[in-house]
Structures are given as C-alpha cells and as structure tokens.
C-alpha cells in the first residue's frame, strides 16, 4: 500500500504469519490470513485498514435511524444487501423486524441464489416493501461460466416469489448488462420470457461499470474486466422490455 512507512509492525502482530516484509515492501498471503484485523488495527500509517466491522442489530439500527428524517420525507428506508443477504438471513430478518418496529420500511436485495425457505421468510415480513432480484443470465452455461453456479435455483426462487400475490408487486428484476456475455438478442429474450411468465412489472438495467476492479485489487484479489454495451444497444434492450414485455424499465448508469 502507498501509505506504508515500512515500520514492520504488521509483521510482528500477525499471529498467522501471513505478512512478510522485503525489498518490494509488505506482502500478504491471503490464504493464511484469518482476518483477525490485528495488522489493520495497529497500522500507524493507515496503510492497512479494516473495511468492515462486526455489529449487532441494535448498532446497525442506530446508524440507520440517523437518516430517519430523510426516509420520512422520501418514503425510503433500509436496504439489506451483501454480498448475499441470504448468507446472513437470520441477522437480516432481525434487523428488518427491528426497523419495522421503528416505522422504517425495508428493501431486500438478493441474487436469488440460496435457501428458498429463508428468502420467502425474509420478503414476507411486514416491514419489507421492495425486493430487488438479480437475474444475471438465464442460460445455465453462461451463468455457470461467469457466476460460478447454476442459474436453476435463481429461476426457481424468482418463480416462487412471484407466485405469491402479496410479494409479486414488491419485485423489481435487476439485470447487469455486459457486452458479449448477456446482451445478445437470445439472452435478452430469454430474460424477457422469465419476466413475462412471472408477471413482474418492473425492471432495472445496470450497464457494466469497472468500479469493482479497484476494490478487488485492494483486497489482493483479481477481477476480470468487461465492457458495457453501447448506449444504442442499451436503449434497444430498454424498448424491448417496455414494448414487448410490458415492464416499466429504467436504466441506472450512463445511457
């Protein structure tokens, strides 16, 4: 990290021996790191710093309540997201209930890949007014290649939620658009067929951006870089979902 002053304190406090110091500076073996945060908490130069912290439901709610005035004026509220919210479903459910008790509504943002029971439990809670459901690709081979898992559970879950008349109006399908990956005519029409079948009436298109590249680099990871479809192609996709599928469609990002 550019702020490093070469004091070597991080090497001394790392009980996992995941940090070494040489001519090239600090090197971190991520496979050995236990995320104890001793290095970051003791870094005088702030070259290593924690990007997250453990919190209780009450502590999170205290942060959320700081903006309650804005929620009251705009109709907004709390969004539980991730990562994947289903990886922390119990905590998310407790947070949603606590927020509802304070008069704060919640939105569940999910990839749809996880326990159907846990997902249904979360979105059925009285405090949940919106569900953002990601559909990245409908073709299973494409989904496995770029997401790493089968799209089967995702499609099963979106069908499960949309079959519930109380949940259906809450759902907005969100689709990242990546040139050469999921923006072909066949890919878009396959997604449109699912949306039409489920009776979902809201779609948000998310043209690809590279903001995650720097974040991945900062944690010693690598992320493949893609490109967004052209503005013209995004406009065509938007018209298709509006005119052929009958869904209100918005684009987040440059068009």
Question: What does each model-found stretch correspond to?
Answer:
Residues 185-189, 193-198, 206, 235-255:
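C-terminal accessory regions of radical SAM enzymes
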Residues 1-9, 26-35, 79:
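N-terminal pre-triad scaffold of radical SAM enzymes
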Residues 9-28, 38-54:
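Iron-sulfur cluster-binding cysteine motifs and their immediate structural context
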Residues 17, 46, 98-102, 244-245:
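Conserved dinucleotide-binding and phosphotransfer motif residues
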Residues 58-214:
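Conserved AdoMet/S-adenosylmethionine-binding subsite of the radical SAM
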Residues 32, 53-59:
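FAD-binding FR-type
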Residues 193, 199-201, 216-242:
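A structural motif corresponding to the C-terminal lobe/cap of the Radical SAM core domain
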């Amino acid at each position: 990290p550019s702020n490093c002053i070469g004091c070597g304190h991080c090497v001394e406090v790392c009980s996992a021996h995941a940090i070494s110091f040489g001519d090239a500076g600090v090197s971190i073996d991520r496979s050995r790191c236990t995320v104890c945060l001793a290095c970051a908490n003791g870094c005088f130069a702030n070259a290593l710093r924690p990007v997250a912290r453990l919190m209780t439901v009450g502590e999170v709610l205290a942060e959320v309540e700081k903006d309650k005035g804005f929620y009251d004026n705009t109709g907004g509220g709390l969004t539980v997201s991730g990562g994947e919210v289903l990886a922390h479903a119990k905590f998310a459910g407790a947070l949603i209930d606590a927020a509802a008790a304070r008069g704060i509504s919640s939105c569940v943002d999910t990839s749809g890949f996880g326990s159907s029971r846990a997902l249904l439990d979360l979105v059925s809670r009285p405090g949940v007014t919106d569900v953002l459901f990601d559909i990245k690709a409908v073709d299973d081979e494409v989904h496995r290649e770029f997401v790493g898992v089968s799209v089967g559970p995702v499609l099963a879950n979106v069908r499960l939620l949309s079959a519930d008349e109380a949940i259906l109006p809450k759902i907005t399908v969100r689709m990242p658009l990546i040139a050469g990956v999921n923006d072909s005519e066949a890919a878009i029409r396959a997604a449109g067929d699912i949306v039409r079948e489920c009776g979902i009436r809201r779609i948000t298109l998310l043209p690809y951006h590279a903001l995650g590249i720097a974040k991945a680099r900062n944690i010693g990871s690598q992320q493949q870089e893609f490109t967004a479809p052209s503005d013209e192609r995004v406009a065509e996709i938007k018209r298709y979902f509006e005119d052929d599928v009958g869904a209100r469609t918005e684009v987040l990002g440059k068009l």
